[in-house]
Amino acid sequence: MEFNMNDKYHLSLKTAFASEYAFALKAQNFHWNVEGASFPQLHKLFEEIYNAVYDGIDTFAEQLRALQLYTPASFEKFSMLTKVADENEVPDQGSMVAELLQDSEKMAGIFKICYEMAEQSGDHGLANFLAERQDIHKKYS
């Protein structure tokens, strides 16, 4: 089956949404489970990250609905779409930081691609939102 531009655009948006949710969950997981000498600083940083990311998820869902798209809304769908690897273990604090840095860079790239597609589609309001999400991830990468 061949996809048209809208299909690719819509799939990219859903992938970004699922990846953003997975990223927020990972940051929250690390916030809850961080241990070690830098616990206070990392506990606070991870909370800041997941709050910054999670704050945009509802708006992102509303943006998708404005395009008449249904948002992925189950862990099964998230796992099928996300580009952020799940973390089933509790890594050491250095690995937590490294993972979130790498994932934040990945998310900035995902949002950049979606931004460009939104601009090409004339969805300038959504493009602005996606640029803001990209900036948040650049801050943490």
What are the roles of these predicted feature ranges?
Residues 2-8, 23-48, 110-125:
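Helix-loop segments that flank and shape redox-cofactor active sites
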Residues 1-16, 93:
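Disorder-to-helix initiation segments
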Residues 19, 65-73, 103-106, 110:
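Alpha-helix capping/hinge segments and adjacent helical runs
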Residues 12, 58, 62, 81-132:
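Acidic/histidine-rich alpha-helical segments that form the ligand environment
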Residues 38-77:
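Conserved alpha-helical segments that form or flank metal/cofactor-binding pockets of metalloenzymes
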